[in-house]
């Protein structure tokens, strides 16, 4: 626990100020409530069979629904689906989704995970999702073992001529051939090629070194299209049209200037969870990448993902229930907080805390900005209506998946409110 001095002062002064009549109408309403039937069943299951520590739950019924939503979109266009491994960082989870979706295409972002993927999924096709330092690529080759053939099954993402030169030198030193996918800046402005002259330099270098470099395609990542950009900057449709103009320009340039590099089997990757549905409206790309949309954390509550359902939750037990909020040094004066705010009339200390997550169930729970956050035993406040007791579970919904899923050890897969499997995460 770390008392936030600024919030402490503002909080105590604020309560005092609000006691006067001019602020009475601002008094918070009671936001508390009991578990829904869904979370009541999960609470009972975890109290009976769970480990009584913070866990990350994957709801397989909801995950199935999300996979099917994605696949209906993909099948309408005849494209392929590539799973974003960093957003689904568990071999069991990836395998489950891959089997239901019928795909062995992965996108990897981290050298240790890449080596793991190559060993565990020897039939997979892997595209790097970001350009790795050449030393990371070298470490991949040094530690790689198994039947996975990088020369045929791995695409290195390259963003500029300088990095391509480094990879060429590595390929020459290893006496191997590398498949090169070129990152395009289609409007995200996070690096990648945005100039045809630069693209020409890279394609020329690939064409001049066929023993060590092979052109594998393009990647144009466009999540901003579906992220709710203010309308004054362009509608999703307008932003999407601009993305595809840039992508098409790079494709046309390559076909015209380097026809020997072009063939039908190239990987023309695009999209991302917020924007994959938009690509039903184009036939240029060959595949879309999706990861986070399979689990739909809070930051992906977007109009473009309205058909998706939240499928991942943190569950953690209540360790202590101590009544009305009580702030160190304020002691009895803390009663002002609970008098003013019904949502501070119960205090719970949970196992762990301070995650990238938002309270989900029971409704009306909140962290305490005056007391401060804690990763050990976080104070959580609620009204009398929440009905929590010691060892009941507090449920939170992650704001994102790629970092959060790695923090809890094995994921617990649930179906129909029952624990049915556990899946280790990447390490």
Question: What do the predicted segments below correspond to?
Answer:
Residues 12, 173, 179, 185-306:
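Active-site loop/helix belt of alpha/beta enzymes
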Residues 55-62, 85, 128, 132, ...:
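Catalytic cores of large soluble enzymes that bind and process phosphate-bearing ligands
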Residues 58-65, 88, 92, 162, ...:
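Conserved active-site and cofactor/substrate-binding residues in soluble primary-metabolism enzymes
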Residues 83-228:
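Active-site-proximal beta-alpha core segment in soluble small-molecule metabolic enzymes
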Residues 47-59, 124-127, 145-155, 229-241:
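Glycine-rich tight-turn/loop motif centered on a GG-T
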Residues 70, 167, 247:
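Aromatic/hydrophobic pocket-lining residues that form π-stacking "cages" and hydrophobic walls in ligand
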Residues 2-142, 423, 427:
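A charged N-terminal "starter" segment
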Residues 241-427:
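Active-site anion/phosphate-binding pocket segments in diverse small-molecule metabolic enzymes
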């Amino acid at each position: 626990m770390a008392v936030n001095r600024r919030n402490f002062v503002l909080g105590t002064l604020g309560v005092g100020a609000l006691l006067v009549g001019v602020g009475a109408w601002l008094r918070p309403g009671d936001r508390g409530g009991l578990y829904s039937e869904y979370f009541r069943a999960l609470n009972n299951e975890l109290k009976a069979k769970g480990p009584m520590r913070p866990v990350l739950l994957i709801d397989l019924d909801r995950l199935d629904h999300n996979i099917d939503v994605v696949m209906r979109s993909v099948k309408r266009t005849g494209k392929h689906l590539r799973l974003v491994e960093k957003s689904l960082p568990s071999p069991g989870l990836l395998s489950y989704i891959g089997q239901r979706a019928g795909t062995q295409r992965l996108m990897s972002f981290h050298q240790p995970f890449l080596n793991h993927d190559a060993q565990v999924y020897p039939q997979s096709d892997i595209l790097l999702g970001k350009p790795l330092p050449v030393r990371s690529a070298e470490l991949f080759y040094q530690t790689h073992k198994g039947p996975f053939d990088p020369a045929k099954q791995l695409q290195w993402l390259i963003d500029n001529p300088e990095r391509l030169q480094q990879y060429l030198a590595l390929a020459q030193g290893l006496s191997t051939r590398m498949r090169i996918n070129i990152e395009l800046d289609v409007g995200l402005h996070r690096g990648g090629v945005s100039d045809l002259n630069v693209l020409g330099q890279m394609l020329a270098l690939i064409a001049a070194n066929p023993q060590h470099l092979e052109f594998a395609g393009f990647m144009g990542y466009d999540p901003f299209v579906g992220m709710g950009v203010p309308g004054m900057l362009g509608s999703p449709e307008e932003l999407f049209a601009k993305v595809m103009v840039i992508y098409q320009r790079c494709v046309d340039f390559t076909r015209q200037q380097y026809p020997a590099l072009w063939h039908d089997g190239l990987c023309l990757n695009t999209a991302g969870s917020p924007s994959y549905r938009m690509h039903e409206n184009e036939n240029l790309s060959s595949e879309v990448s999706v990861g986070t949309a399979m689990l739909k954390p809070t930051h992906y509550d977007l109009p473009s993902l309205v058909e998706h359902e939240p499928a991942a939750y943190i569950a953690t037990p209540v360790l202590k229930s101590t009544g009305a909020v009580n702030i160190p040094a304020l002691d009895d004066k803390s009663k002002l907080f609970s008098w003013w705010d019904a949502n501070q009339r119960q205090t719970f200390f949970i196992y762990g805390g301070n995650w990238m997550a938002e309270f989900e169930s029971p409704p009306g729970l909140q962290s305490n900005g005056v007391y401060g956050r804690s990763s050990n035993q976080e104070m959580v406040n609620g009204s009398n209506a929440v009905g929590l007791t010691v060892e009941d579970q507090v449920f939170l919904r992650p704001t994102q998946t790629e970092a959060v899923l790695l923090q809890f050890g094995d994921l617990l897969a649930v179906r129909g409110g029952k624990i049915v499997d556990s899946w280790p995460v990447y390490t």
